[in-house]
Swiss-Prot record:
Alphabetically ordered keywords of this record: Acyltransferase, Lipid biosynthesis, Lipid metabolism, Membrane, Phospholipid biosynthesis, Phospholipid metabolism, Transferase, Transmembrane, Transmembrane helix
Gene name tied to this protein: GPAT8
Source organism per UniProt: Arabidopsis thaliana
Reactions mediated catalytically: sn-glycerol 3-phosphate + an acyl-CoA = a 1-acyl-sn-glycero-3-phosphate + CoA
Motif HXXXXD motif per UniProt: ranges: 310-315
Compartments it resides in: Membrane
Function: Esterifies acyl-group from acyl-ACP to the sn-1 position of glycerol-3-phosphate, an essential step in glycerolipid biosynthesis.
Protein name: Probable glycerol-3-phosphate acyltransferase 8
EC number: 2.3.1.15
Pathway(s) this gene product operates in, as recorded in its UniProt entry: Phospholipid metabolism; CDP-diacylglycerol biosynthesis; CDP-diacylglycerol from sn-glycerol 3-phosphate: step 1/3
């Protein structure tokens, strides 16, 4: 490979013909991704690994970043983004956000024509000015990349926190990208080079063929199904991609949204459930109820066991509102404060199978009971594996399909403080909830009446709920979710130890 090879004019990606290519070196922002700006992803790191205040500081610094980028150097502009977003953060928190938050937003921004070229190559290398720690998980797990050549951030070895500065040779732009390709490939030139700006010409000139990825209105993103892995789990409070405009709107709405969420929570708290359905609409919360709602149990008979898929912590409350009466629910983890503020009785499970079964049978003797056998929430259109314990408790099983829409904030979290979940949900300008009551399980599909095994009943309930919602049923569990998003097994003790 000749380091003296001059830069040249490269043809557009549309002229790249199908062929056998062993290796490729491609830029990320504006090349494999539709957007040329990495600001939204730095904003996500600043907010989700840091705080809303850090995100605000980053947003206010954007004019200075743009001026530095355009009139001083590309390197300086990116260095400012890195310093404000990363300085003082634990490297573990940055890694978790890169694995749990960023992939969902990156996945929605993958450019179709460049990814199709990238995907056909055997050896795939991404060369980017972004910090490696920020993009490596997505590139390898979802784009199928083999290596990421990017900017390395400096970490204080004593505290394991990012200093905000970068390691030598600095931010990977221009000639530094060329040197990184030389070091990675040696004398064997990459077959293809893809870039979107003139500063990419340095490394593209080393490739046997190079193509420019121009910003065009006709450019489209690929369906998420085309990625190497599906995105089932993700974390983070921000529901929409924080472009500068979205970020400004979010911060302007934040104080009003917080006040509105307090009103929405505490105004409805003392009201009877049969009235709350109407006050929700008054306060901008859209509630849709479908299906036949069973009447309360007769004295001396067991209550109905309402089996729900789990979208947010509000699921049991929405069912109580739909029924127009108080019903008890069981939950896997709940704070004392949340128990005090809950408008319906809530009982924490012990995770001891025999103890939990005995407690739930006692609750059913007193009346109706709500349970979410997935054990944790799932934001995407998937259902996790249903724990079969509920099928052993009663034959009076009523499946309920739950769904909700959140435009600005997510009302669930893995790494954050769960107490704030309902408040973030109600901070959305126009949140909506849907509850669809299905027919009670026929006797032949129960354990006692039909001779089915608990697992068969659980799988059947998962299937009928999934069919109504159009969700895919999976074998994934709470443990799978927390291992991916939080780096622990999902047990309360493990979660607390991780946060220390």
């Amino acid at each position: 490979m000749s380091p003296e090879k001059k830069s040249q004019n490269f043809p557009p990606i549309t002229e790249c013909r199908d062929g056998e290519y062993d290796s490729i070196a491609a830029d990320l922002d504006g090349t494999l991704l539709l957007s040329r700006s990495s600001f939204p992803y730095f904003m996500l790191v600043a907010v989700e690994a840091g705080s809303l205040l850090r995100g605000l500081i980053l947003l206010l610094s954007l004019p200075f970043v743009i001026i530095s980028y355009l009139f001083v150097s590309e390197s300086l502009g990116i260095q400012i983004l890195i310093f404000i977003s990363f300085a003082g953060l634990k490297i573990r928190d940055i890694e978790l956000v890169s694995r749990a938050v960023l992939p969902r937003f990156y996945a929605a921004d993958v450019r179709k024509d460049s990814f199709e070229v990238f995907d056909k190559c055997k050896r795939k290398v991404v060369v980017t000015a972004n910090p490696i720690v920020m993009v490596e998980a997505f590139v390898k797990d979802y784009l199928g990349g083999d290596k990421v050549l990017g900017t390395e951030i400096e970490v204080n070895p004593k505290t394991n926190r990012a200093t905000g500065f970068v390691k030598k040779p600095g931010v990977l732009v221009g000639d530094l990208k060329r040197l990184a390709i030389l070091k990675e490939f040696g004398n064997e030139s990459p077959d293809l080079g893809l870039g979107d700006r003139t500063s990419d010409h340095d490394f593209m000139s080393l490739c046997k063929k190079g193509y420019m990825v121009h910003a065009t209105k006709s450019a489209t993103t690929i369906p998420k199904e085309r990625l190497k892995n599906r995105i089932v789990f993700h974390d983070g409070r921000l529901a929409q991609r924080p472009t500068p405009l979205n970020a400004i709107i979010t911060y302007l709405w934040l104080p009003f949204g917080f006040i509105l969420s307090i009103i929405r929570v505490y105004f409805n708290l003392p009201l009877p459930e049969r009235f709350v359905r109407y006050t929700y609409e008054m306060l901008g919360i859209h509630l849709t109820i479908r299906g036949h709602r069973p009447p309360p149990p007769s004295p001396g008979t067991l209550g109905n066991l309402y089996v729900l898929n789990h979208r947010t912590a509000l699921d049991p409350i929405i069912v109580a509102i739909a029924l127009g009466r108080k019903i008890c629910c069981v939950t896997y983890s709940v704070s004392r404060l949340s128990l005090m503020l809950s408008p319906i009785p809530a009982v924490a499970l012990t995770r001891d199978r025999a103890t939990d079964a005995a407690n739930m049978r006692k609750l059913l003797e007193k009346g109706d009971l709500v349970i979410c056998p997935e054990g944790t929430t799932c934001r995407e259109e998937y259902l996790l594996r249903f724990s079969a314990l509920f099928a052993e408790l009663s034959d009076r099983i009523v499946p309920v399909a739950m769904n909700c829409k959140q435009g600005m904030f997510n009302g669930t979290t893995v790494r954050g403080v769960k107490f704030w979940d309902p408040y973030f949900f109600f901070m959305n300008p126009r949140p909506s909830y849907e509850a669809t009551f299905l027919d009670r399980l026929p006797e032949e599909m129960t354990v006692n009446g039909g001779g089915k095994t608990p697992i068969e009943v659980a799988n059947y309930v998962q299937k009928v709920i999934g069919a109504v919602l159009g969700f895919e049923c999976t074998e994934l569990t709470r443990k799978d979710k927390y291992l991916l998003l939080g780096g622990n097994d999902g047990k309360v003790e493990s979660i607390n130890n991780t946060k220390k």
